[in-house]
Amino acid sequence: TLSPYRQEFVTLAIGGSIGTADEGLTAPVVMVKDVPELQSLPAGAVKGKIVFFNGRMERTRDGSGYGKAVRSRTEGPSIAGTLGAAAVVLRSVGTSQNRIAHTGTLSYNVTSPRIPAVAISNPDADNLERQMRDTAAGGKRAGEPVLLKVRVTSRDLPQTRSANVIAEIPGTDLANE
């Protein structure tokens, strides 16, 4: 973040995300939990802003929390782009507490503007959430915008030929015989 507190976040581009211009993109942040909350905002609420999807993945034994949380990553950038957002920052869809974000892919809707999308780790998302709360009504920095600068170097490359190697190492199928 550039303001109100200077803080560098570790980001990873979401698979399939477009990049930003070389100088990056700076804009105020709007925090939402998930896609339904984004869609419930008044018209123009995210125009030219960075949407921060802050929904936490629920830790479950069967992994069902992942399915509930992943929509913000897969569909969120297209929906935010349609609403006029400049970029998306996503709380990592995972429960790890290290500073390396979990990513995956997104699916741009062919009729929606494509905007850059990055993931940040849970600890970095916690810091950004605190900054958003500090600047909200009643916070100690109420009224100050949270400004983020995002720089994404992703780009589409032309298709090319590649190959996978599939092999069998003799003796591994029946190793004990």
Regions found by a protein language model. Name each.
Residues 1-8, 85, 90-107, 123, ...:
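Protein/peptide-recognition domains central to ubiquitin and immune signaling
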Residues 1-50, 54-62:
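Noncatalytic luminal/extracellular "stalk/propeptide" segments of secretory-pathway proteins
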Residues 16-20, 27-32, 41, 61-77, ...:
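Second-shell loop/turn segments in exported
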Residues 32-35, 53-57, 90-94, 120-123, ...:
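Active-site-proximal beta-strand/loop segments in catalytic clefts of secreted hydrolases
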Residues 41-46, 75-86, 103-109, 172:
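Mature extracellular/periplasmic domains of secretome proteins
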Residues 43-45, 49-71, 77, 92, ...:
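Catalytic-core environment of secreted peptidases
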Residues 82, 86, 108-164:
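Long, well-ordered, tryptophan-enriched scaffold segments
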